[in-house]
Amino acid sequence: MKSKGVESRKRLLKAAANEFSVRGFHDAKVSEIVKKAGFTQPSFYLYFQSKEAIFAELITDFHSRVRKLTESLLLENGLNTEDVSKRVLLAVETVFQFLDEDKDLTKIGFFLNPEAKQMKKDLAMVLKENLEAEQRLGYFHSELDMETVAECLVGMIEHLTESFLLTGIKDPASLAAEVVNLLIYGMLPKGNDVR
């Protein structure tokens, strides 16, 4: 595809993400997508067969990017304790930054997508695998069930994204700091370990 065609396709995808985010899949219209992108309706069909096809592409792209991002966040071997908390903070902040960079795509990919529940299960599984590998490296308590930790992390990220990130109430850095402080240091004052 020529560069003009690539740019046109990107504009249509961006406009579609916004339309689906605002109206939902069923109420979104191809006529509104092309209007937002500055195209005619026939030009839409040069790039996509249907509204379903462009929605599916947006979802597939979001899911694959989330998975790649999650897989890339595995902590490397040889970190000291202080560096582990810094790297965990960086990893959680990176996830929130990703979800914040295209709020329309996040809304449809993480919340409106009929496959969102399965996507989050897949995300939790990749996180669990990362956490178990990091646990074997001695970064986390050996008695923690990393499946539970992964599910908690996904739930926290999902809820905080919907409540604070997509609404603009909090930014990725502050959300990441709160999540990491809770998970790494807990809610009790220093020195009050419950084990």
Swiss-Prot record:
> Key word Repressor present in the record?
yes
Give a GO molecular function annotation for the protein. Answer: DNA binding
For this UniProt record, the keywords arranged alphabetically read as follows: DNA-binding, Repressor, Transcription, Transcription regulation
Know the name of this protein?
Uncharacterized HTH-type transcriptional regulator YdgC
> Residue ranges of the HTH tetR-type domain?
6-66
Identify the coding gene: ydgC
DNA-binding region(s), chain positions: 29-48
GO-annotated cellular components: protein-DNA complex
Phylogenetic placement of the source organism:
Bacteria, Bacillati, Bacillota, Bacilli, Bacillales
In terms of Pfam families, this protein maps to: TetR_N
**InterPro entries on file:** Homeodomain-like_sf, HTH-type_Tx_Regulator, HTH_TetR, Tet_transcr_reg_TetR-rel_C_sf
